[in-house]
């Protein structure tokens, strides 16, 4: 079983890197199908039943794409850290400034 690794340790590393690369490529390929496919248009001269089926599929597709996501993304206002606007506030006692040369 280990006859393919009978050479040096470098060949084992090459095999492990190749396997890791294959696993990474397969995991990326599965991530591409995260969104559903767009429904196919039935054409201009399609019967009413096909058009109704198509419109239902489009409505379902739009509902899936635009659904609300719950969790950290439900904030109504964007998160801005307070230290960015710290100088714009009137309270400067918590952030003293040394403008005099006496400290040197």
From Swiss-Prot:
Pfam families membership: Hormone_3
Organism from which the protein derives: Lampetra fluviatilis (European river lamprey)
Modified residue annotations for Tyrosine amide: 70
GO biological process, one term: neuropeptide signaling pathway
Compartments, as annotated in UniProt: Secreted
Source organism superkingdom: Eukaryota
GO CC term, one of those recorded: extracellular space
Protein name: Neuropeptide Y
Family, as annotated: Belongs to the NPY family.
